[in-house]
Amino acid sequence: MPNFPRTDLAVEAEAIHRSAAAVTELPGVRAEETNRRGFSVTEVHVLDAAGENALCKPTSDYYTLALDPLLRREDDAFENAAQTLAELLRRVLPLMPDASVLVVGLGNRAITPDAVGPDAIDSVMVTRHLREQLPEHFGQFRPVAALAAGVLGTTGVESADMIRALAVHLHPDAIIAVDALACAELDRLGRTVQLTDTGITPGSGVGNDRAGLSRDTLGIPVAAIGLPTVIDAGGFSDDPRAEQMFVTPRDIDTVVRDAAKLIGYGINLALHDGLTIGDVDMFLS
């Protein structure tokens, strides 16, 4: 069996497997690129069992948002990126107007490349308690709770167990999980955001798989949003020791901070109709 590069991105997996098979299209897989507000969005649709076998990913739709205009600091790039991310999130997680949502940040805040999830939670508008206590002022907002779940090594509790217990108590209608991913191409490292409704397995990007979060394990829809922050060093070296190493950009602190804010704002715009970036700024200030 070929030794394919490690990646969590469906767009990379599609290209890698298609190239290895020397075909223009994989069976059961459809890929297309669109442009939204000046941002490139690649859609990979795994259609059936043939697609699952070809791509080694569950049947679903995978959206990859390229952040190039934002990284170039183009005018209105942050707002356009956040609005585009919100549109994609609404596609993977359609919700009734008053459906409640639990947003979960996965990862270890103390390790910068793994801090995307916890840092994104800092930019999420938490409204569940406000709706309950001040319905006259916050009744128009969707009930949203948030959790930075931590990691097993610092909490002694599996993230999935913690989230499952909280879900039993809160009864959310859906969960949004944010996590760091691994990619295979330098052009995508810290430069793309992937969204899907298949859920997520914490730690899978670096070969440290934990219990998964999905509709199958939690009983409700689980949307996953991920930013690739590491790349397998084995792709750059023939030294077998490199297979146990991952590399990350030297400006990863800035990359994670900016992307986490974008993801948080995109979640807010997706969950609360009619909000603007200015509204979110004011709420979080």
Language-model region placement:
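A structural-propensity feature for long, helix-poor, extended segments
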Residues: 139-167
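Gly/Ser/Thr-rich loops at beta-strand to alpha-helix junctions
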Residues: 106-114, 153, 180-184
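Helix-enriched interaction subdomains in cytosolic or periplasmic regions
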Residues: 55-83
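Proline-aspartate-enriched helix->loop->beta-strand connector
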Residues: 167, 172-173
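N-terminal amphipathic/basic leader segments beginning at the initiator methionine
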Residues: 1-59
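A structural signal for small-residue-enriched, beta-sheet-centric alpha/beta enzyme cores
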Residues: 147-148, 161, 177-285
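Short glycine-rich or small-residue beta-strand-to-loop segments that form or flank ligand, phosphate
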Residues: 66-68, 100-111, 146-150
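Glycine-rich phosphate/diphosphate-binding loop of Rossmann-like nucleotide-binding domains
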Residues: 108-142, 146
